[in-house]
């Protein structure tokens, strides 16, 4: 069995390490992968959005199964293209990936099907949006409709900042066509929970919950990043919250997508906020979260490839999906200056006894050395019986990994510990 994983970050490394547990799989290719993933898969220099290159590679190398992990190729229709040449895939088709690809689509879907989310208005005209902001409640949240590298959400605590956001998205086209339409929505408050799920379009099985740490600095300060660390499970996700989510959000979403003729198959990610008025959807993603995947998959006891095949074949209801009852913590080591400006090319040293705990995101291999090549460089995941031990053990490994200009948050898991 030859597998191809599209993508090249820490999430893909976590997926590949988990897939390797399956004995049927003889070969894994990563497109493009990275210098760290190269230890676990054969990396092929084809970019994740080069759909022609991906399809050609798959055909020429008799790939048996493809996992498309990042948002862009999914939204661009990578799965549709691979299925068209007979390759079964894990990941939604473009008509379902739109749940992440268009915030206007997802907000309208939730409104139509009564799925709880922040109240909102949609605008395709900057003047109307600016006029609305004269009287809108503040703080308010401005979201570019399309994909924007995780930067398309602006929380404005003054009317002036809100208007500036509208101008930069709609008039200055900061995110290009992604800003042709915007959503302006109610500002919600409460603890956030990430829930990744497997769904085959009918059945939905939530994975263990997790908590991301999106801001760059300790104490949740500084700019938003792709995520500086995660813990799982999330202590705010109690059994009662899980039941509410299943009844009001998870099942209704899967049914809504089916009813719209857009059955979602793959990993559907729910970004949730537990507000005083109940759990609400902040965002959907059409893929595994990063770095949520680096704590969720290491806790998965069942075989990932078996579950993925069941999702593709519409047999998820017959397939066990079991998680460990332990805790996981992942600390991201980044290049200092991320997410704005950072230097690259520094040698990374990872002690041999902990390489299996390290998921590499931004590193290149050169002359046998592993060099930093991105903002988020790697994630270090520890598992333990108690959350505190997982956090301590992850930080103990971080202290043993070296590269110049390394930066990491020192408080991953602190909020989760305080919630207990
Ligand atoms: P996203 O880029 O969609 O992941 O959103 C980034 C972050 O913005 C989320 O994780 C939330 O912390 C925050 N956010 C998004 N929408 C809202 C909202 N309506 N109210 C409060 N915070 C929000
Ligand atoms: N960690 C959030 C995301 O993957 O979008």
Short names for language-model regions:
Residues 1-94:
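ATP-binding N-terminal substructure of ATP-dependent carboxylate-amine bond-forming enzymes
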Residues 21, 36-38, 90, 112-114, ...:
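Solvent-exposed alpha-helices and their adjacent loops that cap or buttress functional pockets
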Residues 43-49, 121-125, 156:
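Short acidic-hydrophobic, aromatic-tinged amphipathic segments that line or gate anion-handling sites
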Residues 246-268, 285-353, 366:
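Active-site "cap" helix and flanking loop/linker of ATP-utilizing ligase/carboxylase catalytic domains
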Residues 364-367, 372-420:
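Generic C-terminus detector
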Residues 152, 156-293:
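Internal nucleotide-binding/catalytic subdomain
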């Amino acid at each position: 069995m030859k597998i191809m994983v599209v993508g090249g970050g820490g999430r893909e490394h976590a997926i590949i390490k988990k897939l390797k547990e399956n004995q049927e799989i003889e070969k894994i290719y990563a497109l493009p992968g990275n210098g760290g993933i190269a230890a676990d898969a054969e990396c092929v220099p084809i970019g994740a959005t080069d759909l022609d290159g991906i399809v050609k590679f798959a055909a020429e190398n008799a790939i048996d199964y493809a996992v498309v992990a990042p948002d862009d190729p999914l939204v661009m229709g990578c799965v549709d293209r691979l299925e068209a040449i007979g390759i079964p895939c894990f990941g939604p088709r473009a008509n379902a990936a739109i749940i992440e690809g268009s915030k206007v689509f997802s907000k309208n879907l939730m409104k139509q099907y009564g799925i709880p989310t922040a109240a909102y208005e949609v605008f395709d005209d900057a003047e109307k949006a600016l006029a609305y902001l004269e009287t809108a409640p503040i703080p308010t949240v401005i979201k570019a409709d399309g994909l924007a590298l995780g930067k398309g959400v602006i929380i404005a605590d003054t009317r002036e900042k809100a208007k500036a956001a509208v101008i930069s998205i709609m008039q200055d086209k900061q995110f290009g066509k992604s800003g042709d339409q915007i959503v302006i929505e109610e500002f919600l408050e409460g603890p956030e929970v990430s829930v990744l799920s497997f769904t085959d379009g009918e059945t939905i099985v939530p994975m263990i919950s997790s908590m991301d740490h999106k801001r760059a600095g300790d104490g949740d300060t500084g700019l938003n990043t792709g995520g500086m660390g995660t813990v799982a499970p999330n202590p705010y996700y109690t059994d009662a919250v899980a039941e509410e989510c299943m009844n009001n959000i998870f099942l209704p979403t899967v049914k809504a997508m089916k009813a719209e003729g857009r059955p979602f198959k793959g990993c559907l990610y729910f970004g949730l906020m537990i507000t005083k008025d109940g759990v609400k959807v902040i965002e959907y993603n059409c893929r595994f979260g990063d770095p949520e995947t680096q704590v969720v998959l290491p806790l998965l006891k069942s075989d990932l490839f078996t579950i993925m095949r069941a999702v593709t074949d519409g047999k998820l209801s017959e397939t066990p999906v079991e998680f460990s009852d332990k805790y996981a913590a992942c600390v991201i080591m980044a290049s200092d200056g991320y997410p704005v400006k950072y230097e690259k090319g520094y040698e990374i040293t990872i002690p041999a006894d902990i390489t299996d705990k390290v998921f590499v995101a931004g590193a290149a291999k050169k002359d046998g050395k592993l060099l930093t090549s991105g903002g988020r460089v790697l994630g270090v995941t520890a598992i333990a019986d108690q959350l505190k031990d997982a956090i301590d053990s992850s930080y103990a490994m971080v202290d043993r990994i070296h590269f110049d200009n390394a930066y990491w948050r020192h408080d991953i898991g602190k909020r989760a510990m305080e919630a207990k």
